[in-house]
């Protein structure tokens, strides 16, 4: 029939427009929030527009995995709430158009959003995470975060730089307290930071002294012309040279989980995380594409429940549903890490629970006439 087809295009257009609006707003909020964390390092290394653009591109790609489903929920809630506020849904029902005709365009759009989310989750987002480490490694190699006149902590090492000239550092002081019983203090007139092909970070110091506190009665001083000092940058870059679950390509991750969980082969030291982390990450990527479908099914009956204040109502419900969904994933993930749940149960239980809630709300909305 021509009427349902026209109606479908109308509903789809409304949802798509609000989704694009939500995607712009939510992406900007998430991007600025995460970019602020890296801004100190960016400015400390010497601001460059190429660095900012690289961070924006990589962070934007990573955050899109969550921004897209939440934006679709936002679009469904606002579009349906606006239709309800303008009494358009009542008019549709008076013309004999049921819930099925209204839901079909939303389901169709949710499948498109799910396909995009799946592509992001399987390989695009992990690749962006790997690139983010490369961006930070590049910043660190130029002395990222070592702002003259300020102390910066790298693990158990406190670093102070008196001045900077290009990529070179002047007046470097290091306090290494990785061994509290034998602290080490290093003074150097100059130095540079370098990242090798394997991602190891080395601070090349020139013309300085090493002060070793061997005993409570005696201090040892060693002078040097050049001294290479390896920094522990695990907090900034993660475990160097080891495979992290969140950064692995999907095929490698699946093979790792099969080898560990199915065949029982233990992980060697080349892997940064525990076996449960790799299994949780695998099921996180597999479950991610279901979020837009669930949000679409939830958004329709929720949006039809109220007619006034559609925009504020939709924004509040969007935040609440998204928080509940992703919060439940985090909660069950913590239970799995403690050994109380298996990884598949921890990842798929929220999906099953929200699916049951969505179908119950749809059935109730259909029964009570919206």
Language model features by range: what are they?
Residues 1-58:
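Hydrophobic alpha-helical transmembrane segments
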Residues 10, 14, 18, 101-110, ...:
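Start (N-cap) of specific transmembrane helices in multi-pass transporter permeases
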Residues 25, 60-79:
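Long, hydrophobic alpha-helical segments
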Residues 43, 273-363:
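Transmembrane alpha-helical segments that form the functional core of multipass membrane systems
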Residues 50, 54, 109-224:
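Non-transmembrane, extracytosolic/lumenal segments of membrane-associated proteins
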Residues 76-90, 95:
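Transmembrane helix boundary and interhelical loop/hinge segments in multi-pass membrane proteins
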Residues 93-98, 339:
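Short helix-to-coil transition segments within interhelical loops
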Residues 196-201, 206-280:
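Mechanotransmission and gating elements of multispan inner-membrane complexes involved in transport
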